[in-house]
Swiss-Prot record:
Quaternary structure and partners: Has multiple subunits with at least A(3), B(3), C, D, E, F, H, I and proteolipid K(x).
GO biological process, one term: vacuolar acidification
Main location: membrane
Cellular component GO terms, alphabetical: plasma membrane; proton-transporting V-type ATPase, V0 domain; vacuolar proton-transporting V-type ATPase complex
Name of the protein this chain belongs to: A-type ATP synthase subunit I
Lyase as UniProt keyword: no
Keywords, comma-separated and alphabetical: Cell membrane, Hydrogen ion transport, Ion transport, Membrane, Transmembrane, Transmembrane helix, Transport
Function per UniProt: Component of the A-type ATP synthase that produces ATP from ADP in the presence of a proton gradient across the membrane.
């Protein structure tokens, strides 16, 4: 706790014949972050033809999964599935070598891909044909006002017929231009067609170029005349029959696709996951060094996993390997990855730390601290017992349903569960139950207009004590941050930074706290401490910034004041939550007074529950964001950089498959 997991450097040299099996073992173990071997005398390894095939088959099967997934019957879903998702069953694959896996994949694809591609091609062809028929029906609908055999509208010999749509306002201008260019050797028919005019132009074939130039100039949208004979209405009936037939064929094809999805979807997904992991596994090959007989790899391993990894390497290589495990050198510390290490109760809060950035090797891990302070700030800003209860119930259900997955949803819900506890606690202390709803109920039941729920403090009626409490919390939070910064810098040998950058603010905060306490006998001591802190701060600015000291004194001082005052948002959001809830209650009271056919109470209940649920969601979102901001900007700015490199192990991703490695 407070310190990341210890890391050691692993170096391995072994025979090439163990490469595939060893990489597969490390990939499944997921405990080593592989790094590039920096050796000038050896060659870099490269993916072979089987790795390239794995990448190719991954793309092919992604398309098959996408197609089959579209026509697969949805399993589960809904609210229950959201809260309590089921684990996907995993099939075991006995891994011997990459060549054998590729052979199995090719055998599987040779069986299922032709079936799937055939039905996919048939469906694509039918869909294209249906769209073509719909387009032709649309054209026939436009031609309906002409009421002539559409065969007359096609080109025939020396006469050329063009049918199209043009802007109504340009019809006369177009007709005049055509007559002029063709020396009146043209016939023009116009009909109204929705927002444009339908024009039929009959001209001599020799005038083709002249006519087409004018059609382009006047933006005439040409229509392709559908095949067949008869009036547009007669042909529309024929095409509608064709459309119905093709749509029926498409539905039959979709049913066949659904059957194929039920039959093959899980298998395709299984083999896709196998080749996906092989493709990902091949990405480390360029990091390895090799000779004709051997290869070398290096990487970082968390100390607790070292023994397991060493035993696995020795077993796979039959002891024919050079293995070196050593402490990181001084020049390697900056590139050493960081894996957070926290007790179970704080582990989900690592998500908040990682969103900002993991600590450097010489920093502390703030996760255990923010596990408490973040939840407390969230609760302080939401500050309503029943809002906290709603958030807590939802979070508890998600925690129960997602715990086995340990996924992002579980971690987020766990954080909300702790935050809901503090929301309920502080809501009870401030007497807020859907705002003043509890007070209204008590007054209605007892008939006493002064009755109210027990509370330690009413934020809406006594905002100043609430503001002072928020600022006091902020001062304590900043003091903790500066203290941690002092300890870190002192321990890392930066004594000047500890004394001149961290210590002055610690002393100033103590002085401010003593002055604010207004206790008799402490006034002189408080002023002396505050003066000492300010003097040390000024000296520190001179030592660190030299000629810019005067400017930096103003900047840093007002920066500190700004950070401190930022904690006033604790009070502001608490008041906003109570205020919104109270407004909803006032609206409900106004509507409730309508007694006609019980409309008032019915609408009032809808407004009450709908409004309070909306208020819970919007205020919880605000509390979540602002609690993060107080940590990321104000708190972390005092001691934490988050510039470490996150530990990213060479690890497989498996949801539906499980590998059994044959050694």
């Amino acid at each position: 706790m407070f310190r990341p997991e210890e890391m050691v450097k692993l170096e391995v040299i072994t025979l090439n014949r163990y490469k595939d099996t060893l990489l597969t073992y490390l990939h499944e173990a997921g405990a080593v972050e592989v790094r590039e071997v920096k050796v000038e005398l050896a060659q870099k390894d490269t993916p072979n033809e089987y790795h390239r095939k794995a990448a190719s088959y991954s793309i092919s099967m992604s398309r098959l999964v996408e197609f089959l997934g579209t026509y697969r019957k949805a399993a589960g879903g809904g609210i229950k599935e959201f809260f309590f998702p089921k684990e996907k069953p995993k099939r075991t694959y006995r891994y011997e070598r990459l060549e054998k896996l590729i052979k199995d994949v090719e055998e599987f694809l040779g069986k299922v891909e032709p079936e799937i591609k055939a039905i996919e091609g048939r469906m694509n062809s039918l869909s294209t044909e249906i769209e073509r028929i719909k387009e032709q029906i649309g054209i026939l609908d436009i031609l309906t006002p002409l009421n002539i055999d559409v065969s007359y509208l096609r080109h025939c010999g020396v006469v050329e017929v063009t049918v199209g749509l043009v802007d109504r306002t340009r019809v006369k201008e177009l007709a005049d231009a055509l007559k002029k260019e063709t020396e009146n050797h043209v016939a023009i028919i116009t009909k109204e067609a929705s927002d444009k005019a339908l024009v039929v132009i009959v001209n001599l074939a020799r005038d083709h170029d002249k006519v087409n130039t004018l059609l382009a100039k006047f933006s005439v949208e040409k229509l392709e005349i559908p095949e067949g004979e008869g009036t547009p209405k007669e042909l529309m009936k024929e095409y509608s029959k064709k459309l119905a037939e093709k749509e029926k064929e498409l539905e039959e094809a979709k049913k066949e696709a659904s059957k194929l999805a039920e039959k093959y979807y899980d298998d395709v997904l299984f083999y896709k996951e196998l080749v996906d992991n092989e493709r990902d596994k091949s990405t480390v090959l360029p990091m390895l060094a090799r000779t004709n007989m051997t290869f070398a790899l290096t990487g970082w391993v968390p100390r607790p996993d070292v023994q397991k990894i060493l035993e696995g390497i020795k077993r796979i290589t039959e002891g024919k390997a050079y293995i070196n495990v050593r402490e990181p050198r001084k020049e390697e510390l900056e590139e050493m990855p960081v894996k957070l290490k926290n007790p179970g109760w704080a582990r989900p809060f690592e998500m908040l730390t990682e969103m900002y950035g993991v600590p450097r090797h010489d920093e502390i891990d703030p996760t255990p601290i923010i596990a408490f302070t973040y939840s407390f700030f969230f609760g302080f800003m939401l500050t309503d017992f029943l809002y906290g209860l709603i958030v807590g119930i939802v979070a508890a259900l998600l925690v129960k349903g997602h715990k086995k997955f340990n996924d992002g949803t579980y971690k987020f819900a766990y954080i909300l569960l702790w935050s809901a506890f503090f929301t309920m606690l502080l809501g009870a202390l401030f007497g807020s139950y859907f705002g003043n709803a509890a007070d209204i109920m008590l007054q209605y039941i007892t008939g006493d207009q002064n009755a109210h729920a027990w509370r330690l403090l009413d934020p809406l009626r006594e905002p100043m004590p609430m503001l002072l409490a928020a600022l006091a919390i902020g001062l304590a939070h900043l003091f903790l941050g500066y203290t941690l910064g002092f300890v870190i810098k002192w321990k890392n040998g930066d004594r000047k930074g500890a004394v001149f950058e961290q210590l002055p603010w610690m002393i100033i905060i103590i002085g401010v706290a003593l002055l604010a306490s207004q206790r008799e006998g402490l006034d002189a001591a408080a002023k002396a401490i505050l003066g000492t802190g300010i003097a040390l701060f000024a000296v520190g600015e001179l030592v660190i910034n030299g000629g810019l000291a005067a400017l930096m004194i103003i900047s840093d001082f007002f920066g500190f004041v700004g950070n401190w005052l930022s904690y006033a948002r604790l009070m502001a959001l608490a008041l906003a939550t109570g205020g919104i809830a109270m407004v909803i209650n006032v609206l409900v009271g106004m509507v409730w007074a309508i007694k006609f056919l019980y409309i008032g109470p019915i609408i009032g209940l809808i407004i009450f529950f709908g409004g309070q649920l909306f208020s819970t969601a919007i205020n919880a979102l605000g509390a979540f964001v602002h609690a993060l901001r107080l940590h990321y900007v104000e708190f972390f700015g005092t001691f934490y950089s988050g510039e470490g490199k996150r530990f990213e192990p060479f690890k497989s991703k498996r949801e539906v498959s499980k590998l059994e490695l044959e050694v």
